[in-house]
Regions:
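FIC/Doc superfamily catalytic core
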Residues: 1-174, 178-300
Length: 300
């Protein structure tokens, strides 16, 4: 990760403040909207949702559970719930991770979608060839997992390790992947670490790395999480209101901010040469109005 812990801490502090400000003012296309749409679209998409990014944005903007052009109302309901769950994660950053809190996340996500949201599974389930916990084992295993996690200083490695164990237990009937990724996102923020979103485009790497971690090869999944941290920071950094921090982040990430100069690459004679041409055929310079001058310099 090219960003120091201190720079990550500053990023998270600024990010949380800007999320709160933009939520209140409903700023379009800002840090908040960009984060929610990316978080929800990708984490729903890799679970099989058919909604496009545009449809996801529409659900976010309207907070509606019905899309006229959607033939999968269940996807819409889950997407609407997911956007609310994102807000819940931020509203609860001061709360320690507990089994009951994990159930609350699941309730936010699956309300109106399944009969018993926010409750551990009562029937067995599986993830491909992975052997998950039996229903009667879930309460004890989750209690132990959370208790052990909370004993140690938060770090990306510990967050990733928690995520793998949570997904292997698979404590809910459905929604385990989305809840697990939501926990990882929130715990990164609580730890002052740049959060990461598992993208639909990188899901094969994610799933392969999960399997490798279960087999004892931990480096690939941690490296994947670090790469997704860089991806997230690269997207958000140019949009931060704190220009000094934004520039520091972009510099460390090796990203050059666009330079909006007067010379925008337009072709043809300049107003000065045009004036000369007009004068040469008997026109006066007064016919070229001063208020037609173009100034393209823009602060970003």
């Amino acid at each position: 990760m090219p960003l120091s812990r201190e720079l990550q801490r500053r990023f998270v502090h600024s990010y949380i403040e800007q999320i709160a400000s933009e939520r209140e003012g409903r700023v379009p296309n800002g840090v908040y909207e960009t984060s929610v749409v990316s978080f929800v679209f990708n984490h729903e998409r890799i679970e099989g949702s058919s909604l496009t990014e545009w449809q996801t944005r529409t659900v976010f903007e309207t907070r509606d559970t019905v899309l006229a052009d959607s033939t999968t109302p269940g996807n819409v309901r889950e997407t609407a719930n997911h956007t609310k769950m994102f807000d819940f994660l931020f509203d609860s950053l001061d709360r320690e991770l507990t089994p009951e809190f994990i159930k609350e996340i699941h309730l936010q996500l699956m309300a109106g979608v399944m009969d018993v949201p926010g409750q551990w599974k009562i029937l067995g389930n599986g993830v491909g060839s992975v052997i998950t916990a039996r229903p009667e084992e879930v309460p004890t295993l989750i209690d132990c997992l959370v208790s052990e996690y909370n004993k140690y200083e938060p770090s990306l490695e510990n967050i990733v390790r928690f995520h793998v164990r949570f997904e292997t237990i698979h404590p809910f009937p459905d929604g385990n992947g989305r809840v697990g990724r939501a926990i990882a996102f929130r715990e990164c923020l609580r730890a002052g670490l740049v959060p990461f979103i598992v993208t639909d485009a990188s899901k094969e790497t994610y799933y392969t790395s999960l399997d490798e971690f279960r087999a004892g090869v931990t480096t690939p999944l941690i490296s994947y999480a670090e790469a997704m941290q860089v991806d997230f920071a690269s997207t958000i950094a140019p949009m931060l209101a704190d220009r000094s921090l934004s520039d520091s982040l972009l510099g460390k990430l090796g990203i050059e901010r666009p330079d909006f100069k007067d010379d925008a690459g337009f072709v043809g004679p300049s107003t000065k040469s045009l004036k000369s041409s007009l004068d040469s055929v008997g026109k006066t310079g007064s016919e070229i109005k001063s208020d037609h001058k173009t100034h393209c310099t823009r602060r970003v």
